[in-house]
């Protein structure tokens, strides 16, 4: 293993410390070494190691203070490399992690020899004995750090294997719960995020406190010895491999741009759902857990740059794969049904940012850029809805004046879209800001003030889009209503569609909040106007034939005119009943309101006309010939209207 260039950095750090304070620290380490040596060791070897350590401290202190050091080395100091070398051999046989006390003794010895080597290199003494001792100590130090590096990697990998075993056991015991969770995820596009505290608890169970403590000591010893690059490389390789296994186990292999473009939307929907699930797991479990692990293994304040570099490297390698996939999805052909998956992906990347905020800013910018592209695609897709409304110009009217399929599709689409209200508002607001920034501003009035004065900008960006879609739908329905030759049916069509729209808005808190009360009141007013127009077109002429004007000639009721009036009423009412019983008013409340309003308009007028003029007709066959309906019959036949089923009057009578 080659020693890294970080040795120079370690030297600079050492120079910043006062020699006396470090010597005092060395004394303390020697005392700790003395007290922490296992009782099973012989008394002579215990004292020998402590004496050697103290002799080394004194030796370094002497060399540092004398102006012209002779470079004489005592037997105790001379034996120090060999003593550490023996510890290395012992640890190579037993390995770290078996005895915490022995681990501490070994790591303290490595720290001591590393500091000794670094101090002597700083002094640059021209002494053959010192040079010889330094060469031997350097060789032992390299061997010791190599062992630490090997143990470091082994401990990281062993913990990963234990994690896999624990996960497999958990999956075996909790299989039914897992199946339930998976089915729930498949039933809904929108994943349920895990609680943050649960995420942290799950993320750290694979490393025991003892393992964390040992990893921390090894990392500190390697970095102090000038082997920061080697330590970081081992850590990063192990954790990257762990992440690769994790992603493979949950089924994320990643597909390239060509694959995304080639597969059908149904298959791609499944890939997107898996992507969302995995990225959210990274956001809530894996990345926070990785940050916690990194902070635990490299806790020193001096290691902040190490922590950031390692965390950034790890999350970048994983996140770039996620962003490649989202970038490929953005390039697929746009269509309205894709909006909600795009918004799911947008939200997923938005929620990923807090999990990587401790990483390099460049990575965060990459995520934001990918998020922006998804947002722009969502805006374009939403625009497809507007295009579909404009282009729906069929010339065949919907039978019976029923709710048009375009109305149903648009309102259901908007209802679902409003479940993403906050996200869509954020998307459109960001899009409008970018569009405005890219356009020249010819007005001298400040743009913000202009917007504040504009009523349109008092609602949210997404609300403005909703209003625009509703205006387009209204205009399209108005055109479609003109396809009906019967003006009465035209107003039934407008009432049906208007009522459907209003009920959808009232049934959705999100849409109602976006559209506002004034818009809803305006829609209700339009419905009442359609209702009045229908009454005027359908029943105006019926009421006219029951008018008293023209019935009297020279002060007497003209029987021929009266008979004609009854005939006209019968014919008109028969035709209305025959025709409008086949029409559909799908909303039961509106159907009832229409029948009640017709009854209140027609029945009193007919009862009055019937009661006043029936006596002027000859009784018997003449009366039955011209008076076809009793007043109570009128109410019964009105109740047949708007059911969508033709009714035989003769059969009913």
From Swiss-Prot:
Disruption phenotype: Shorter roots, slow growing and reduced seed set. Slightly reduced male transmission and retarded pollen tube growth. Complete inactivation of pollen-specific transmission due to abnormal pollen tube growth in plants lacking both EXO70C1 and EXO70C2. One of its GO terms (cellular component) is pollen tube. Phosphorylated. The gene is EXO70C1. SUPFAM superfamilies: Cullin repeat-like (SSF74788). Interacts with ROH1A. Binds directly to B1L. GO terms for molecular function: phosphatidylinositol-4,5-bisphosphate binding. Residues 1-34, 159-177, 438-451 have a biased composition (Basic and acidic residues). This is Exocyst complex component EXO70C1. Required for global plant growth and for male transmission. Involved in the regulation of tip growth of pollen tube. Pfam families: Exo70_C, Exo70_N. Residues 1-50, 159-190, 432-456 are annotated as: Disordered.
